[in-house]
Amino acid sequence: ANVSFSLSGADSKSYSKFITALRKALPSKEKVSNIPLLLPSASGASRYILMQLSNYDAKAITMAIDVTNVYIMGYLVNSTSYFANESDAKLASQYVFKGSTLVTIPYSGNYERLQNAAGKIREKIPLGFRALDSALTSIFHYDSTAAAAAFLVILQTTAEASRFKYIEGQIIERIPKNEVPSPAALSLENEAWSLLSKQIQLAQTNNGAFRTPVVIIDNKGQRVEITNLASKVQIKDVNSKLLLNKQNIA
């Protein structure tokens, strides 16, 4: 695997080290406003990196991540691989986990479909190290409904934390006790990454101003407009994005 994280003996330092390693494992050729810009495209096996996660019992799961958008395409448990029911994941299955027995999960990996499959919304699903342990255990012993809820925990603890320093901090706060995500974290996960990525890139040729303001929710549940690169968002650190998605420039 390119990056790995084990819950056994983990603390805030080892988790932060893992998230930093995950960011570094995602290739970037340029920066915009000092934020790494992910590749617009990649082909073949070079489009994916592998991330290994282990629960407290040292049961390991390996996940394949698309380097252009930090989406999890599928995962490997022992000799069985599981891929989301979508075209990008089918493509990934041609390049990663070769020789494994392939199972198609009956839903795609976006939040709405995962929430439908899980029968739960993210607002009600706690995050934290114990939540991550339960999620990894659920995925290890595959059950499609439990796996959907587990995926929601894993996505936020890994991919979203790598995109936003703020979300990484939110997970660290939840290490000692499970707690549902903050309104600000959920707001950032809901399209804000794509919208902010696009506007930050467009602002380069617009004197630092966004062409379209991006509205996010702060920790108190209030709407906040980000209008330019210098916007000091009321939520501490919420706009310290650490990765940008190149695909969203139009």
Curated annotation (Swiss-Prot):
Catalytic residues identified in the record: 160
Matching InterPro entries: Ribosome-inact_prot_sf, Ribosome_inactivat_1/2, Ribosome_inactivat_prot, Ribosome_inactivat_prot_CS, Ribosome_inactivat_prot_sub1, Ribosome_inactivat_prot_sub2
EC number: 3.2.2.22
Domain of life (superkingdom): Eukaryota
Annotated protein name in UniProt: Ribosome-inactivating protein luffin-B
GO biological process: defense response to virus; negative regulation of translation
UniProtKB keywords: Antiviral defense, Hydrolase, Plant defense, Protein synthesis inhibitor, Toxin
Enzyme class: hydrolase
Enzymatic reactions: Endohydrolysis of the N-glycosidic bond at one specific adenosine on the 28S rRNA
GO molecular function terms attached to this record: rRNA N-glycosylase activity; toxin activity
Similarity comment text for this entry: Belongs to the ribosome-inactivating protein family. Type 1 RIP subfamily.
Disulfide bond sites: none
